[in-house]
């Protein structure tokens, strides 16, 4: 049977459920698909189908993630749900499932728990722009004062980690009642989706961002200057535009004199295209893999940054022993490895395999970077960790 063509008539948003174990993330995901299926906006997906999430590999790390899709009146959503806490940590740090927004699920019967905090913090660290809260299991709470108290606690927690706790929509409901087809259960799910539609901002499309292309390869064509190849990460490059070569060395200015794709000449290359770009007056030895081509002034090279990192466990093929301050692995950014030194916070003696941690890194050469950039940590060619730049230190 031929695959159904994906009709993209509505704007697309990537979203995910986050929150403490057993607070009802997977039940809520199932409930959303069941309620929206009634208006033809989704295919109803049962709890156990979502819970049996397939394993995927992202940058050498195995993560279990379930994906469902659905649509509301205004948007098309791809929704990700992870079965285990470790899967969330890995998912958010590696960016395996990009999230433009999140639904934080908190059980009204328990209130915020340790993983509630950790997921909010992670969402902040990795740059999830907005979230909406679903206060689940309200059918188990008879006392309205208690509900109010839990809502206050959630708002305080969100504010503590830098989200606008006073403004974030909090929807009260019961995923279980929605799954059972009870009207009050379904009403809450519809309210939740209205809040997600209106409160989570439309993401900026990759083509609308400044031009950036990580350089994968460099060739010289006799008599026709230098060609660099790579996949355009964001923005658009047009023939005749001035661009910068950033990272590893001093930033250089050059001009794009041609864009080639599959041996054909184009007027422009855009986000997602694998292209060759001809550079005017740039010598073969002045450019190398690991640098980026970028719109002038849009990105700067840096060698010191703070990062949120997940360290692979021994079972995942990571280190067998913890690492301590001044550990010097390779940091793999986009297309290249750069050696760097890790500085742990004063209160941390070591980082164990299987942990996630925050620390500072000092690279031996600067890399074109901005907050939110993902990287791998490698040692002798194998991946031992994955991280995201949370703050640049100059």
UniProtKB/Swiss-Prot annotation:
Region (G5): 174-176
Superkingdom classification of source: Bacteria
Binding site for GTP: 19-26, 81-85, 136-139
HAMAP family: EF_Tu_B
Description of how the protein assembles with itself and partners: Monomer.
Record keywords: Cytoplasm, Elongation factor, GTP-binding, Hydrolase, Magnesium, Metal-binding, Nucleotide-binding, Protein biosynthesis
Domain tr-type G residue range list: 10-204
Main location as per UniProt: cytoplasm
Stretch list, region G2: 60-64
Location of region: G3: 81-84
EC number(s) reported in the record: 3.6.5.3
Name under which the protein is recorded: Elongation factor Tu
Region called G4, residue ranges: 136-139
Pfam families associated with the record: GTP_EFTU, GTP_EFTU_D2, GTP_EFTU_D3
Lineage: Bacteria, Pseudomonadati, Pseudomonadota, Alphaproteobacteria, Rickettsiales
């Amino acid at each position: 049977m031929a695959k159904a063509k994906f009709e993209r008539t509505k704007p697309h948003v990537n979203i995910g459920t986050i929150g403490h174990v057993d607070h009802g993330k997977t039940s809520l995901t199932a409930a959303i698909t069941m309620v929206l299926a009634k208006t033809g906006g989704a295919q109803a997906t049962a709890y156990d189908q979502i819970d049996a999430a397939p394993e995927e590999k992202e940058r050498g790390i195995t993560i279990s993630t379930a994906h469902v899709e659905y649509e509301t009146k205004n948007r098309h959503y791809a929704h990700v749900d992870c079965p285990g806490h470790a899967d969330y940590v890995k998912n958010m740090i590696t960016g395996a499932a990009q999230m433009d927004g999140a639904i934080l699920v908190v059980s009204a019967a328990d209130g915020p728990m340790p993983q509630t905090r950790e997921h909010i913090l992670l969402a902040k660290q990795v740059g999830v722009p907005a979230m909406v809260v679903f206060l689940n299991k309200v059918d188990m709470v008879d006392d309205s004062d208690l509900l109010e108290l839990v809502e206050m606690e959630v708002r305080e927690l969100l504010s503590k980690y830098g989200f606008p706790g006073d403004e974030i929509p909090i929807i009260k409901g019961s995923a279980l009642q929605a799954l059972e087809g009870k009207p009050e259960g379904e009403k809450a799910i519809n309210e939740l989706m209205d809040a997600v539609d209106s409160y989570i901002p439309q993401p900026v499309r990759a083509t609308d961002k400044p031009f950036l292309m990580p350089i994968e390869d460099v060739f010289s064509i006799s008599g026709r200057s230098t060609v660099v190849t790579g996949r355009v990460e964001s923005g658009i490059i047009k023939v005749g535009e001035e661009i910068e070569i950033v990272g590893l060395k001093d930033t250089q200015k050059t001009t794009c004199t041609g864009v080639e794709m599959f041996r054909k000449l184009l007027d422009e290359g855009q986000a997602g295209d694998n292209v060759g770009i001809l550079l005017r007056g740039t010598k073969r030895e002045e450019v190398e893999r690991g640098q980026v081509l970028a719109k002038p002034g849009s990105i700067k090279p840096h060698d010191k940054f703070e990062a949120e990192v997940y360290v692979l466990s021994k079972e995942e093929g990571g280190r067998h022993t913890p690492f301590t301050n001044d550990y010097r692995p390779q940091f793999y950014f986009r297309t290249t490895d750069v050696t760097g030194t890790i500085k742990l916070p004063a209160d941390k003696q070591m980082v164990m395999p299987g942990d996630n941690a925050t620390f500072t890194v000092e690279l031996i050469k600067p890399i074109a970077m901005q907050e939110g950039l993902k990287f791998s940590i490698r040692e002798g060619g194998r991946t031992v960790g994955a991280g995201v730049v949370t703050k640049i230190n100059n």
